[in-house]
């Protein structure tokens, strides 16, 4: 039966060319005998010459024995002895024949796989005769594409340099060299046209079975493997027939056989690359996903940024946050205060420091899914979010010749402090009230004005939750506002003693009532003070920054030192204020309650003298150890107060609470009137 079927394909070449597609030779391969019989019947109705087999290995053997015996191959996908895709690959590589895949599986992935492996068409069972009547176009398309590619390869070989292959030197010289425009010369065109004509004649001679044929080499699997190994060793771009033949070292194999096989191999690779380039568009059109394609980026992780290690808590720099527009004289000018006035932003070395003994219990509250642990090096820089803290920068220079009884003769030399509100976390989490410095209309140097400068000053050191927003109003009367530096530190053993919050504010107002910020959550309390200087104080007594080295320190060894946690705010007349000022030199006081953790909080007290002013004095019980080299004057008018320093530190102050206190800022202004019972008053030296 096989011989009879093979005889059906023996038709003179001239007759086939005249009646094409009648007599087209088709090889049908299917393991199902019923489907194979139906396919054969339909192909015979289309007047094709059909050869059938139920095994892929037999079909491959037939093709290798006589590759010119068939024009088209139709193969099933699923076969027991050999997969249809494997047969497709071997046929396309060795014989360069059009192959049509046939299967009952019409899934997109299966069809795409067949097209990727080089199938020219994919038919679904049961096959219709209308589909089989048009399969001849694949044969014509393959012949024309092969001829065009052969001409292109020949053109590339003509343009190769002489050192690429010694065998091509003669052909390169014969073809001539291209002109300056890159176009081939007339001599090359004529040579190429002659080669095309000779190729057509040779094709007709080969198709004619009566013409003598050259002995052909059957490219077996082992022979093809040697060929592929030689090509891979040389490289597909530098592989030439002569070098491949030398590396293969096979008897009865000529250079022409290797050149022909190399050409088919290149065509096969080009076809695979062309199909692969169209694969993406096909998948996009069908709306599916192909597992053979390259995987794209992971969804949702494009904005991910890994934690980067930097210097430990590098954002906690003493001078890093004095960049707010409110601290810029030019920016102050845009808000109503002329930039030409001597309003200077303060820069100092006093910082808000935190000493942590057990760092593993402090965690950062971060946005989104970002998490940080201070126990892991305290050096986590979280992506693009840079943590910035609020710092209080204080002026450490001498405050001499600042206050003047005649007004602002030298400009407003006293510095106005504005707490920098650089964001610790993104703005959607930080709802901090931003300070504003306004003047209506401006600050004049020689006139007494009643304009007010509103500023928010204060620092919060939250143990559980803290909210501080201190509004202060400074009337610009006959004096220039001057700041008295306070640097305080206290230690306490339990956060509950302070109600979970401690804050330091330094407001100053001209009225008798004082706006004090308190946190209503957790029983938080705030303390601070404002000192008012009488207008009749002479200039010589107002020179701050004396050079004497007297310091008053609270003895750390004193066990009976008491610090009353209830602070009282009251108002006293300006005449009584002079007798309450009791510090002549720079002094510092320290309150300790047997703990090692500290939180230094700096604040500024702005003094302003008016006829009727309010004095804010915290009620504290402290003991001073005063040096004996100088006695304290009795009259406050003989005093000059250079600096008042105190230190404030909290042993139980958690870093998490400090962050929450800066993030969650709410303002609850409470007015304390004069009729509040305040208890005993102390001198200013004993209160600050």
From Swiss-Prot:
SMART domains, per database record: REC
Free-text function comment from the UniProt entry: Transcriptional activator that binds specific DNA sequence. Functions as a response regulator involved in His-to-Asp phosphorelay signal transduction system. Phosphorylation of the Asp residue in the receiver domain activates the ability of the protein to promote the transcription of target genes. May directly activate some type-A response regulators in response to cytokinins.
Domain Response regulatory: 25-140
InterPro entries: ARR-like, CheY-like_superfamily, Homeodomain-like_sf, Myb_dom, Myb_dom_plants, Response_reg_B-typ_pln, SANT/Myb, Sig_transdc_resp-reg_receiver
Disordered: annotated span: 161-212
GO biological process: cytokinin-activated signaling pathway; phosphorelay signal transduction system
PTM info: Two-component system major event consists of a His-to-Asp phosphorelay between a sensor histidine kinase (HK) and a response regulator (RR). In plants, the His-to-Asp phosphorelay involves an additional intermediate named Histidine-containing phosphotransfer protein (HPt). This multistep phosphorelay consists of a His-Asp-His-Asp sequential transfer of a phosphate group between first a His and an Asp of the HK protein, followed by the transfer to a conserved His of the HPt protein and finally the transfer to an Asp in the receiver domain of the RR protein.
Location of the protein in the cell: Nucleus
Alphabetical UniProt keywords: Activator, Cytokinin signaling pathway, DNA-binding, Nucleus, Phosphoprotein, Transcription, Transcription regulation, Two-component regulatory system
Superkingdom of the source species: Eukaryota
Signal peptide segment: none
Gene3D superfamilies: 3.40.50.2300, Homeodomain-like
Family of this protein: Belongs to the ARR family. Type-B subfamily.
DNA-binding region, residues: 211-270
Disulfide cysteine pairs (residue numbers): none
Bias-annotated ranges (Acidic residues): 193-208
Molecular functions (GO terms): DNA binding; DNA-binding transcription factor activity
Protein name (Swiss-Prot/TrEMBL): Two-component response regulator ORR23
Keyword DNA-binding in annotation: yes
Modified residues (4-aspartylphosphate): 76
Loss of function: phenotype: Dwarf, narrow leaf, low tillering, lesion mimic, late heading and low fertility phenotypes.
A single cellular component GO annotation: nucleus
